[in-house]
């Protein structure tokens, strides 16, 4: 069968050239309108194979603007994002700029960036503090010499010694103080033997002071320049305790090298029983201001051992509840003054009639239950009357009315009886007396 080629004329407005290819040729080829014959390829394989390259050209032509946009950004970066200047250096691109910023200007959160002015001020302050501490050390040597002279004329016994306790304040910060405590000679010798390996220079470097004591107490000398901001101990003894201040840092106390061999189960300081009351001691322990011992308050600390149980020394006053004595006691018989003052009331008047049985109960029901279940054989005897006690008749109703002699178990019942029974009787008697007086006068 011969092949047929049918020419198709398109309107002139469809013949638009795009990238050198006309839409007329594309559509004509897609529908098989070409000089080639369809032949046996009516299934469409031939004209589809010829059409795919032309469609791929159209897709490639549409991706050209995206490549142009990327190149535009590159050209923009090359034109403006280069030749940076920082710290007198010329940085060619953004990468060098970021690297320079991270190396020179970036500060991490964990770094402690201190201003230069602050560091200079701190150095000057440290130098001035060092010179001040040197002057204080010289003053301390003079003070210890004077203190030794005072100890020669004081009333302290010969079997005691003075041990300096150096507590560094805030790890060597300005404001240290010195504490001297009078201890027995045995404790002083033990402390000296324990610290014999240390040189005198190291020992003197830990002892610093900022004040001069006014007087050497009989048993304890404490003077402090400033209490520490950490944990402190406050002890208030005597009336003049507010004039002295003593505080120690619990954290720095471990570093001290002059601690005598104390028994830590006891308190460090000992006081006489007449020093302070328990109420004053409780109030002072709760107050935030540290207050310390006066010289007159520690007279008995010389003759007695240095360590003493504070719980046995301080005699606590009875509380308000303990001071108020109760109106009656359960251990002794209760005597009622009003009404029925001649009666004696026992808490458990009903006693068991069985010989050698000391059980007693408040009411008959308790005694009845005991008689049925308290012994091997039930007791069928009737419950007796209340047993006389010490020659007096025990009454279960001790409150008696003075008007009608009626008795009640408690005072409330007697009050109710008086209010509702005898008030009307007394009013009737008053009216009767008024009438009798009127008739007599008439």
Curated annotation (Swiss-Prot):
GO molecular function: DNA-binding transcription activator activity, RNA polymerase II-specific; RNA polymerase II cis-regulatory region sequence-specific DNA binding; zinc ion binding
GO cellular component, one term: cytosol
Localization of this protein: Cytoplasm; Nucleus
Main localization (coarse): cytoplasm
GO biological process terms held by the UniProt record: positive regulation of ribosomal protein gene transcription by RNA polymerase II; positive regulation of ribosome biogenesis
Compositional bias annotation for Low complexity: 193-208
Keywords in alphabetical order: Cytoplasm, Metal-binding, Nucleus, Repeat, Zinc, Zinc-finger
Stretches the record annotates as Disordered: 193-219, 304-333
Zinc finger (C2H2-type): 350-375, 399-422
Protein's UniProt name: Zinc finger protein sfp1
Organism: Schizosaccharomyces pombe (strain 972 / ATCC 24843) (Fission yeast)
């Amino acid at each position: 069968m011969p092949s047929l080629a049918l020419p198709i004329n398109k309107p002139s407005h469809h013949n638009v050239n795009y990238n050198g290819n006309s839409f007329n040729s594309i559509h004509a080829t897609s529908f098989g309108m070409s000089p080639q014959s369809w032949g046996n390829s009516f299934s469409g394989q031939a004209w589809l194979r010829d059409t795919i390259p032309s469609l791929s050209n159209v897709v490639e032509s549409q991706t050209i603007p995206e490549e142009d946009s990327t190149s535009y950004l590159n050209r923009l970066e090359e034109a403006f994002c280069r030749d940076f200047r920082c710290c007198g250096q010329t940085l060619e691109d953004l990468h060098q700029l970021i690297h320079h910023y991270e190396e020179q200007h970036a500060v991490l959160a964990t770094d402690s960036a201190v201003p230069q002015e602050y560091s200079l001020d701190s150095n000057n302050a440290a130098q001035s503090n060092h010179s001040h501490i040197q002057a204080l050390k010289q003053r301390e040597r003079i003070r210890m010499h004077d203190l030794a002279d005072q100890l020669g004329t004081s009333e302290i016994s010969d079997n005691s010694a003075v041990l300096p306790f150096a507590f560094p304040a805030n790890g060597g910060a300005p404001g240290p103080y010195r504490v001297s405590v009078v201890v027995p000679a045995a404790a002083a010798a033990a402390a000296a033997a324990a610290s014999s390996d240390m040189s005198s220079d190291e020992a003197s470097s830990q002892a610093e002071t900022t004040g001069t004591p006014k007087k050497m107490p009989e048993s304890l000398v404490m003077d402090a320049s400033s209490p520490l901001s950490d944990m402190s101990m406050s002890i208030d003894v005597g009336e003049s305790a507010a004039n002295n201040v003593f505080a120690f840092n619990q954290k720095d106390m471990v570093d001290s090298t002059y601690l005598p061999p104390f028994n830590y189960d006891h308190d460090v300081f000992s006081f006489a029983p007449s020093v302070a009351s328990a109420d004053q001691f409780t109030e002072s322990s709760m107050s935030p201001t540290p207050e310390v011992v006066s010289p007159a308050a520690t007279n008995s600390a010389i003759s007695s051992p240095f360590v003493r149980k504070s719980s046995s020394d301080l005699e606590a006053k009875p509380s308000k509840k303990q001071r108020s004595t109760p109106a009656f006691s359960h251990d002794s018989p209760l005597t009622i003054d009003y009404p029925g003052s001649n009666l004696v009331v026992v808490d458990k008047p009903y006693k068991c009639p069985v010989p050698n049985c000391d059980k007693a109960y408040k009411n008959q029901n308790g005694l009845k239950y005991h008689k049925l279940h308290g012994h091997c054989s039930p007791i069928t005897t009737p419950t007796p009357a209340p047993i006389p006690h010490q020659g007096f008749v025990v009454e279960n109703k001790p409150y008696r009315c003075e008007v009608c002699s009626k008795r009640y178990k408690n005072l409330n019942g007697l009050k109710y009886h008086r209010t509702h029974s005898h008030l009307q009787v007394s009013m009737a008697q008053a009216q009767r007396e008024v009438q009798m007086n009127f008739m007599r006068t008439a």
